[in-house]
Amino acid sequence: MLKSLTRHNIPKEHPRDNSLKIRANLSDSFDNGIISQFGLIAHGRGEAFDYILGETTPKISLKTIHVATAQLLLSDSVISVNGNSAALCAKSIVQLANLTNSKIEINLFHKSKTRANKISQLLKKHGAKDVYGLNTKYLTKIPGLKSNRKYIDKRGIFLSDVIFVPLEDGDRTEFLKKMNKTVITVDLNPLSRTSAMSDITIVDNLVRVLPEMIKQSRNMSNLSESDLQKIIKKFNNKKQLNLILKYMSKRLIDLST
């Protein structure tokens, strides 16, 4: 059925039009070697949490997006890209990188040179000039991390202050923090290790987050460094996660009555 929908266009009248288009895109991206089979599983897990959010961005998450955008504008930052984020939002990633003067670096858990090159080509198709994380000459390791995501670019993540890692895994977040990096993540699961360990956790769907960050980057581009610092200083990630958990709990209670 998914292949049929991909070929014949999903009708706009379908109540889950956007979700089906995303699934079809991911299915095609798997066939094209952009994402791994594990990426499909990860997306399904996230989609379950998006149902609880009502497939909309809560006001609580909008506040976190505001803080995350301020942090990117203020810092020497890198957007870390994996297969799913590239498949879902390659164009938006490039736009956000340009607006915030962030570097783009590919980092894969299920490492494949072929897949990394395909992701790079996709990003460059949407206007990316430099994509880091491909040239083994410049790769180094995150101290202590054992998975394939330990490899980072000396010119990118290694040098940067802030790492924006949508769809991240908890292990790498932990070790990036040990390197004194500020970690921003997008995770639909507020209970994950990544959510708990990151400095700024946006609980929302990446396909909604990035367009909002692009919008806010444009709106905030003229703010002074001190104004951006004030926005960040007031933020408490643990408090925001507690608020989003309460929001999701209330949603479930309301739906059950």
What annotation goes with each model-predicted range?
Residues K63, L139-F158, F164-D171:
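Active-site glycine-rich loop that binds ribose-phosphate moieties when present
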Residues K12-V67, R115-L122:
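Short, compositionally biased "basic patch" segments
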Residues S75-N82, K103-L108:
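Short glycine-rich or small-residue beta-strand-to-loop segments that form or flank ligand, phosphate
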Residues V81-K91, H110-T114, E168-D171:
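Gly/Ser/Thr-rich loops at beta-strand to alpha-helix junctions
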Residues G170-L191:
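A short, gly/pro- and small-residue-rich
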Residues R193-T257:
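C-terminal functional extensions of proteins
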Residues T64-S77, V94-T100:
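Glycine-rich phosphate/diphosphate-binding loops that line cofactor/substrate pockets in enzymes
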Residues L99-R149:
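Long, charge-dense
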